[in-house]
Amino acid sequence: MSGPVALKQPMTPVASAAASTEPVLQVRDVQAHFRTHHFGVSRDVRAVDGVTFDVRRNEIYGLAGESSSGKTTLIKTIAGAIKPPLEVVGGSIRFSFLPDYPGLHAAPPEVLERVRWRHLSYVMQGSMNVLNPMRRVIDTFRDFAWRHIGGSRRAFEERVADHVSRVRLDPAVLRAYPHELSGGMRQRVTIALATICKPEFIIADEPTTALDVIVQKDVLGMIRGIQREMGSSVLFVTHDMGVHAHLTDRLGIMYGGRLVEEAPTPEVFARPLHPYTTYLIGSLPRIGDDTPRKSLEGSPPNLADPPPGCRFHPRCPLAMDICSRQVPPMVETLPGHRVACHAVNPGAAA
């Protein structure tokens, strides 16, 4: 077993515009496949297939896309939450606070013990059901956070009580069991749990799923407020484009296990370049607009046997012959605006 590995101290938020471009996370050509072997037959599901992007210091980076686009598999890979049959088969995932490993999946257990919760936390999909129903809320905080924060039991509990107050919860909830709390309260508890150690990086997977609109708005405002206060970076995943419009700073669009467009969020909504992004934005309801919404024909690709070339071409209204033959490269078409589309970037694949 390797010896102790020293980790960098938590970073302080940087106010200057130039410094804000410094990446906290660098994802490079990551490939993560579900590999199964049954009755002599091997099967690879290419859930994440060559994804590259950065998350900058003190920003909220959004990932959008329909179900089965690879969003959740990608963030599980980034978080190191990998279990068979999922395997990382290529690429690298480097955090600024852990530069010596090509991903958490490659780090030894003693390093993961130091990193998780203290430097990186993960609000999982369906996190309202993650809390242990047999333990009071304060016990869950002790289980995950006390070893990182240290101090006496009394000092720790006072810090937790102060922190849950920041997410607009009465500290009395700490003595409650999860089933005694509403859905919105449990979600606030999980967000408080993910931020109690003031991590540099937070991954949030569909944190507003199953919440009503009023509670959802409150939770989103709370996430933004805590992120600004701590200066953390957030990788925020949801299929809801309306949520991205109100919360994220930059937005990546995934389709068929690949990133197809990335830009500052206002730019994505004002000037979508990829046909799939245009469809996602066009499907949003608008007050006073009774125009029928046209559905996208076809089905998402089978990632165990994906179509050649661009994976969107069987459903794309702009598809050309080259689309079925060559994978479109991700090209910076406008400053800070990348897109992978032959129709938008003709000749880029040559």
What are these regions (language model features)?
Residues 13, 17-23, 37, 101, ...:
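Short catalytic/signature loops enriched in Gly
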Residues 1-270, 339, 345-350:
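ABC transporter nucleotide-binding domains
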